[in-house]
């Protein structure tokens, strides 16, 4: 047997994954934990310039199915490095690079938005290398970063019911063995355009 590839894992999980919650959507609407009044008009929408100083550096995107993962190491000033790998018995796909985010903006006390400014790959997309055993490694685009312009950073305490549908799917992957909490208990980064989600803690 061989491990599922990234594409196979996404297809499989799309069929079996459903939102895990111990409350109905209507219950959650009535029990939102965020008090919007706690965020002053002077802070909401303010250009923050940097992310929180205590933001964890390392984030990972993984579904728990298949031999693939994508990661981001990010600094509060928006500079980052990223990588991706996917493998099976006969071949592997890898990617890596570095870049910067700009227009970091504080939305509310649990949420920042930012835009991808630059990203440079470490190697040429499509390049293939074969080892002595015939295993082929291909340098690909970086899943999780490629195709994205706008990214959202969620802080612990962010109400999960307010997050977009794409992020809800990754919450289901992340909290695969426990109910999705009403308030996020870790940090997360969400690619709004391609709907990919990263977390700073392992699958639960």
Language-model regions, residue ranges each:
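Beta-strand-rich cores of mature extracytoplasmic or soluble domains
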Residues: 127-204
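N-terminal glycine/threonine-rich, aromatic-flanked beta-hairpin/loop signature
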Residues: 64-128
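Tryptophan-anchored aromatic micro-motifs
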Residues: 38-71, 185-203
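N-terminal Sec-dependent export signals
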Residues: 1-53, 200-203
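Generic hydrophobic, helix-prone segments enriched in Leu/Val/Ile
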Residues: 1, 60, 101, 151-155
């Amino acid at each position: 047997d061989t491990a599922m590839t990234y594409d196979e894992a996404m297809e499989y999980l799309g069929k079996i994954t459903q939102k895990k919650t111990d409350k109905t959507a209507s219950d959650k609407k009535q029990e939102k934990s965020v008090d919007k009044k706690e965020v002053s008009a002077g802070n909401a929408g303010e250009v923050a310039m940097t992310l929180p100083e205590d933001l964890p550096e390392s984030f990972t995107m993984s579904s728990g199915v298949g031999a693939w993962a994508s990661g981001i190491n990010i600094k509060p000033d928006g500079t980052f490095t990223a990588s991706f790998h996917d493998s099976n018995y006969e071949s592997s796909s890898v990617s890596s690079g570095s870049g910067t985010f700009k227009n970091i903006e504080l939305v509310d006390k649990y949420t920042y938005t930012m835009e991808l400014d630059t990203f440079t790959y470490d190697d040429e997309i499509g390049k293939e290398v074969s080892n002595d055993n015939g295993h082929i490694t291909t340098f690909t685009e970086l899943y999780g970063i490629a195709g994205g312009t706008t990214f959202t950073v969620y802080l612990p305490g962010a109400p999960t019911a307010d997050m977009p549908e794409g992020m809800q799917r990754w919450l289901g992957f992340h909290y695969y063995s426990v109910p999705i909490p009403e308030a996020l208990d870790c940090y997360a980064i969400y690619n709004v355009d391609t709907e990919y989600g990263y977390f700073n803690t392992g699958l639960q």
